[in-house]
Structures are given as structure tokens and as C-alpha cells.
Amino acid sequence: MYPDQQKLKLIREAVEEQLTARSLGTRSPEGLFAPIDYTLRLGGKRIRPLLACAAATAFTEAWQRALPVAVALEIFHNFTLLHDDLMDRSPLRRGQETVYRRWGDNTAILSGDAMSIEAYASLAEVADKSLLAELLPRFSQMALEVCVGQQYDMEFETRSKVHVEEYMEMIRLKTSVLLGSSLELGALVGGATVEQARALYTVGIQLGLAFQIQDDLLDVYGDEKTFGKPIGGDIVNAKKTLLLLYTLEQLQGEDLKRLQEILTYTPEERRAYIDEVRALYDKAGTRLYAEAEIERLTAEAYRGVEQLPLREEGRELLLSLFHTLSGRTK
């Protein structure tokens, strides 16, 4: 195992220990806290806490200072997933039954609310209380922007026309700001200047945009075995992804009419037209456009890290995480 991978493993284990130490599974009432414990035990890559601790490592050897922030970010992220599943009526999360399916809508709402509060409780455990005045408004702004992004996402479902620029702004809010804030808050705890931390925030935004575009691509062009779920789900559900919106803007004539016709079908009917829609994406140059955007955004993120005066260990950790995110197949 490479040194950076060993360090990331160490950080991940420390995050898991801190999550366990919060004793969410043993608190009362069980009906409120058991769903929270269940959600956090579903796993995941723990990307956000890893980013926060790696960013701290870029400025100090004492990366453990960032653990309260890292845990806060992970709890908040999982809170958004819990509520997203409820709003989307998703039956499964990471292969397991979602909270609202197992405990009901009301419990999902209340447990999610409690998770968001628990995130703030973890943030408040930062050792340097004077630093908390810097962290709290940034964390709150991030939390609000994630909610704004989710609202836009829901509104897009009922709108007949959504522009690519609007979609990019939505995913910036819904996905990217949490990654950007993970880097920014971790850097601040590590001793970065406000300007250095903000530069890393921008890097996180670029990384988050590339991450979501890659997610859209994998759903249409990924390998089902490595992706972990059926390919073409976004097409079946007529989800307004970058791929669909760009294709609608690029196609003309009969091709455009045909795609618009398929979008009027029911989800079950659209299942038979996944290959045809994929062919229309190819005709519009959508895959090439999306791949070029991922490459551009990822290159900007790497360049942003290379230009900052960081401790070499932290830089290597960040670049290793970026490589994992940008090169993923699932």
C-alpha cells in the first residue's frame, strides 16, 4: 500500500471511530436514533471527511484537529441522502432499504432533522473555539445552498425546458458546495489563510461538477457490473441530466422530434428505447462534450492544488483523492 493510501486508511478509521463514539445507536428514543445509526452504518466512501482531513494535512501535521469538522460534514451529507430518498421515493440506498421504507415518512423527516442538528453538535467540538466563528457561518451557508440546489432539482422535474447553465448551477449547489466546503473548512482548521482556504473551496467546486457529470455519464455509458445498478436509469426516468439537456439543445429536425416523443412515454415504455436515446446522445456529440468538461474541470482542480503552497504530504493526499474521484467507474 502506498504511503498516501495508508494515511487515507488511517483517516478513514479515525472518522469511523468518531462516528461510533457519538453513540447514536444507543440513544433514546430508539425510534429517532436507530434510523440515524442505520444510515451512517450503510457505509459509503467517506469522501467528504477524507477531503477535510487531507486539506488540514496540507497545512499541519495535526490533521486530527479536523475530525470534528470531518464528522460534521459526513453526518450532514448523510442527512441530505436520507431526505433525498424520501423526496425521490427511492426504495434502496447502497443496496439496503431506505429509512422511509423501513420506518415511515414521519420518522425519516424527524431523524433527518436530528441528523442535521447532530452535524452542528460535532462542528461545535472543534478545539479552537475562536475558529468556530469562522467555521459556523461557512457551514451554515453551505447547508442552505445544498437545500437550494435540491429545490431547483425538484422544480426541474416539472419544467418543460431547463438550460444546461441552469443544470450546472443546480449541481454546483446540490453537490459541489459540500465538497468545496470540506476542503475549505478542513484547511481553516489546519491553519490556512482565508485566501488559501477559499482557493481550495474553488477546487472542490470544480471537482464536484466533474464528479456529477461523471455520474451522469456512468448511468448511460457505464458497465453495469462495476456501476452496481442497471444502466440507463436516468433515461428510463427522463431525468434532466447534463446529457439529456445538452442533447435537446444540440439536436434538430426529426432527431429532436424523436427524442421529445420518447420523453412523452411512460418509464416502463422508455425502458425499451435506452439504446436509441444513447444513439441520439452520440449523434449530438454529447458524450464527447461531457468527457471534455470532466477533463477541463479536473485539470483546473489539479492546477489549483499544484499552485498553492501546501505541505507535500497534504498535496499528495488531495491529489490521490482527486484521482479516485475523477477516475471512478461506479
Feature-to-residue mapping (PLM):
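A short structural micro-motif
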Residues: M142-E145, Q206-L207, Y265-E269, L280-K283, ...
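Mg2+-dependent prenyl diphosphate-binding active-site environment of isoprenoid biosynthetic enzymes
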Residues: K7-A14, S23-L256, E295, H323
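Mobile late-domain/C-terminal helix-loop "cap" segments
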Residues: K257-V305
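Hydrophobic, well-ordered secondary-structure elements that form the walls
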Residues: L244, A301, L318
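Non-catalytic interface/linker regions that flank or bridge core catalytic/transmembrane domains
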Residues: M1-D4
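Short, amphipathic C-terminal "tail helix"
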Residues: L297, P309-K330
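Alpha-solenoid HEAT/Armadillo repeat architecture
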Residues: R41, E249, T264-P267, E306, ...
